[in-house]
């Protein structure tokens, strides 16, 4: 981890990170994080009864548990603004909301109707304006006009699906769904699967998302703010997430190890100089501290922050290159999966930029109208 941050610091005058996600590999000695969090979230409907430590409340926006039988959101109401009618997302026609109408539940209903939650994304995705049923096309081909075509309503206690078709093309379906949602206090509950993955998610107020899988491996998607400047800000954001995450684990799992790790993490946050932060991170790696010793890069992108004032020559890019140009002028390096990957493509990017500058200078010095076609091909296509 310290070597990655050291390199990102070395190039931060030219490159800034955009997407950055990573994994914390499961360790047997820390216990069943997934199982204990699942048990706590499943049995409670008040945020305070899950997250006891009030010091970390401002950092955590939402907890989500999703498996095949149940999807449950627990929201921290204090982290949401007061919504007005003009800010509401028009999603009511996707849901039947059941609530006990208490003040707490009514506020949760207001939040649910106003924010773009994963339930909204899921139900919008599963509502298909047009879908071809290829099985019914085969029936038409092989069975003639007597083939049966389904249209109508299918439903269970929590999901109603309406399938409509055109009489002239009955194999083309329009599918609409409505989902029942139960809202009690801080909890938003629906039955059945509402995600591809079975995970527990912790959504932070800074938009960082932590996904915990069944084996307690974690996937962390680190958010990026416009005011993030350089590697030191990135380290502070990551370790701020660590600090609050580990105190949450100590809260739920009752394992003092996480409190000890949170204290070590806090030393990194309190350090003011980058060199001191990197030194402390290196020491954490040497002592096999959770969060550093089991850190594994998932994928990250870099963007070249300086302006490209010369002509861009796409022909210099390999077909499978991770160097991409956005809108012709913005250079991005995408899908980097290791420090070696990063250093390799940054070097390629630097060399390519120099070559483009040289070609651009030549191109600007010649008369395009009189120059030979072969010479122009050499500049533009090779």
From Swiss-Prot:
Keyword line: Activator, Early protein, Phosphoprotein, Transcription, Transcription regulation
Regulation: induction: Expressed in the early phase of the viral replicative cycle.
Pfam families: Pox_int_trans (PF05718)
Subunit structure: Heterodimerizes with protein A8 to form the virus intermediate transcription factor (VITF)-3.
Stated family: Belongs to the orthopoxvirus OPG150 family.
Role played: Acts with RNA polymerase to initiate transcription from intermediate gene promoters.
Protein name in UniProt: Intermediate transcription factor 3 large subunit
Annotated source species: Monkeypox virus
Gene that this sequence comes from: OPG150
């Amino acid at each position: 981890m310290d070597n990655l941050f050291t390199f990102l610091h070395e190039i931060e005058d030219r490159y800034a990170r955009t997407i950055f996600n990573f994994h914390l590999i499961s360790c047997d000695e820390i216990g069943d994080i997934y199982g204990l969090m699942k048990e706590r979230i499943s049995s409670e409907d008040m945020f305070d009864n899950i997250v006891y430590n009030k010091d970390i409340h401002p950092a955590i926006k939402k907890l989500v548990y999703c498996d095949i039988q149940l999807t449950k959101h627990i929201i921290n109401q204090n982290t949401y603004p007061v919504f007005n009618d003009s800010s509401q997302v028009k999603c009511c026609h996707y849901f039947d909301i059941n609530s006990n109408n208490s003040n707490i539940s009514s506020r949760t209903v207001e939040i649910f109707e106003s924010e773009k939650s994963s339930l909204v994304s899921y139900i919008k995705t599963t509502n298909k304006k047009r879908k071809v049923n290829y099985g019914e096309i085969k029936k038409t081909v092989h069975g003639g006009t007597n083939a049966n075509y389904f249209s109508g309503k299918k439903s269970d206690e929590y999901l109603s699906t309406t399938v409509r078709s055109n009489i002239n093309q009955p194999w083309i379906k329009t599918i609409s769904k409505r989902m029942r949602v139960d809202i009690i206090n801080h909890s938003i509950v629906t039955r059945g699967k509402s995600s591809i993955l079975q995970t527990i998610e912790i959504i932070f107020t800074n938009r960082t998302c932590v996904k915990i899988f069944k084996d307690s491996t974690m996937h962390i998607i680190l958010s990026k703010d416009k005011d993030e400047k350089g590697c030191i800000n990135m380290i502070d954001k990551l370790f701020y997430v660590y600090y609050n995450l580990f105190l949450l684990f100590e809260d739920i799992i009752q394992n003092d190890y996480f409190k000890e790790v949170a204290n070590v993490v806090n030393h990194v946050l309190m350090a003011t100089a980058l060199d001191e932060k990197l030194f402390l991170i290196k020491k954490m790696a040497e002592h096999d501290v959770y969060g550093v010793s089991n850190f594994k890069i998932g994928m990250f992108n870099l963007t070249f922050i300086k302006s490209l004032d010369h002509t861009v020559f796409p022909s210099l890019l390999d077909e499978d290159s991770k160097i991409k140009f956005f809108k012709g002028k913005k250079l991005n390096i995408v899908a980097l999966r290791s420090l070696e990957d990063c250093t390799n493509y940054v070097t390629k990017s630097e060399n390519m930029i120099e070559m483009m500058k040289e070609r651009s200078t030549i191109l600007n010095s010649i008369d395009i109208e009189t120059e030979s076609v072969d010479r122009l091909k050499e500049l533009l296509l090779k």
